[in-house]
């Protein structure tokens, strides 16, 4: 796979289709623009797919699972073994994302991109780069080649889903320590002070929280990631799950399929992808504003506004699955509402 050529081949939205969708929206039996963001979503879907009547019936959340060497520094309240346990539990149907996708009419695709354990459960896709990243306060988290391999895993995952007829993708992750790596990546890419980017993750004491902030500062100071080179940032202070998800966002733009951000980790990956190619932003739909404090910095940098503010910080793709249902409503209203001709009434006219 020639990633560079694929990324260079990304194009923008189809403005002609978006204009046609706008015309239909303005002819539906409602005041002009009264469905707000729902109308924007439909236009975006059309601009991505080139379809005047877009469909999002086939939905999947991709969950990238990986361990992070930085957990050696006590940055998480959970032991590293939780990554493997939850990864396996995704196949048992009772995790948060299982419940959310079940009721959103969506599937999940679980990818082991770097879990520090042998994961042999049926249904889990093995794309393990290696068993967890290195401890980033002792050196780079991964090599540049490994970072590129992570992007490739995500791009390929999207292509395979597109080939199967999936037309809406969500992004999720599982990896103890990944709010630490995401904080480092996002702090470098946004210029946000580490103290304002780092949050409590899965839950930390005040002392552990202060330690987490210090660890992120030390990792950035040691590795000196180049803000102008997103792949350098990823390789030095990122994680395999972030790499895979960034690849998913790139893949969505390459293969023209809408993709939904979940929470903080997913947003960090989205930011990374947009820094690689700014056109990727056109293919991204935000879901919720994570309770992690750095989330607002990333959304500001992306110039995106979350649909929901529910103070969630579970991850796994749960916020994306929630947003699926809003996207569904956007499409249903566009496709199923009557027009002024149907209703035999005069259409609304724009105010001058």
Curated annotation (Swiss-Prot):
Which keywords belong to this entry?
Answer: Cobalamin biosynthesis, Glycosyltransferase, Transferase
Pathway(s) it belongs to: Nucleoside biosynthesis; alpha-ribazole biosynthesis; alpha-ribazole from 5,6-dimethylbenzimidazole: step 1/2
- Family matches, as CDD domains: DMB-PRT_CobT
Per its record, the protein catalyses:
5,6-dimethylbenzimidazole + nicotinate beta-D-ribonucleotide = alpha-ribazole 5'-phosphate + nicotinate + H(+)
Q: EC number(s) per UniProt?
A: 2.4.2.21
Keyword Ligase belongs to the record: no
Task: Give the enzyme class.
Answer: transferase
Q: Catalytic center at which residues?
A: 316 (proton acceptor)
Keyword Transferase carried by entry: yes
Output the superkingdom of the source species. Bacteria
Q: Which GO terms describe its molecular function?
A: nicotinate-nucleotide-dimethylbenzimidazole phosphoribosyltransferase activity
Its GO biological process annotations read: cobalamin biosynthetic process
In this UniProt entry, which cysteines form S-S bonds? none
What does this chain do? Catalyzes the synthesis of alpha-ribazole-5'-phosphate from nicotinate mononucleotide (NAMN) and 5,6-dimethylbenzimidazole (DMB).
Q: Which family does it belong to?
A: Belongs to the CobT family.
Designated name of the protein: Nicotinate-nucleotide--dimethylbenzimidazole phosphoribosyltransferase
Task: Name the source organism.
Answer: Clostridium acetobutylicum (strain ATCC 824 / DSM 792 / JCM 1419 / IAM 19013 / LMG 5710 / NBRC 13948 / NRRL B-527 / VKM B-1787 / 2291 / W)
User: Which lineage do the record's taxonomy fields give for this organism?
Assistant: Bacteria, Bacillati, Bacillota, Clostridia, Eubacteriales
Which gene is this protein's source?
Answer: cobT
């Amino acid at each position: 796979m020639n990633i560079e050529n694929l990324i260079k081949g990304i194009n923008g939205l189809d403005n002609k289709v978006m204009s046609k969708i706008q015309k239909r929206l303005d002819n539906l039996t409602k005041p002009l623009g009264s469905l707000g963001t729902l109308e924007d979503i439909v236009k975006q879907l059309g601009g991505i797919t080139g379809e005047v009547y877009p469909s999002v019936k086939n939905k999947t959340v991709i969950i990238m699972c990986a361990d992070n060497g930085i957990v050696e520094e006590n940055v998480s309240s959970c032991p590293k073994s939780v990554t493997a346990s939850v990864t396996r539990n995704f196949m048992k149907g009772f995790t948060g994302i299982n419940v959310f996708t079940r009721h959103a009419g969506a599937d999940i695709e679980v990818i082991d991109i770097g879990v520090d354990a042998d994961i042999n459960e049926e249904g889990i896709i093995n794309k393990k780069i290696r068993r967890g990243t290195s401890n980033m306060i002792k050196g780079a988290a991964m090599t540049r080649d490994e970072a590129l391999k992570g992007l490739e895993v995500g791009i390929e995952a999207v292509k395979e889903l597109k080939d199967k007829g999936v037309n809406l993708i969500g992004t999720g992750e599982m990896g103890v320590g990944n709010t630490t790596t995401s904080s480092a990546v996002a702090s470098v890419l946004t210029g946000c002070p580490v103290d304002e980017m780092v949050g409590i993750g899965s839950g930390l004491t005040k002392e552990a929280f202060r330690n987490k902030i210090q660890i992120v500062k030390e990792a950035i100071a040691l590795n000196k990631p180049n803000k102008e080179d997103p792949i350098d940032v990823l390789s030095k202070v990122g994680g395999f799950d972030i790499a895979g998800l960034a690849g998913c966002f790139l893949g969505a733009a390459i293969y023209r399929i809408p993709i939904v951000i979940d929470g903080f980790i997913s947003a960090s990956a989205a930011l990374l992808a947009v820094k690689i190619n700014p056109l990727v932003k056109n293919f991204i739909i935000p879901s919720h504003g994570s309770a992690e404090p750095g989330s607002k910095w990333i959304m500001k940098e992306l110039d995106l506004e979350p649909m929901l503010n529910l103070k969630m910080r579970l991850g796994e793709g749960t916020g994306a699955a929630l947003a699926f249902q809003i996207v569904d409503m956007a499409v249903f209203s566009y496709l199923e509402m009557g027009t002024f001709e149907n209703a035999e009434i005069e259409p609304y006219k724009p105010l001058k």
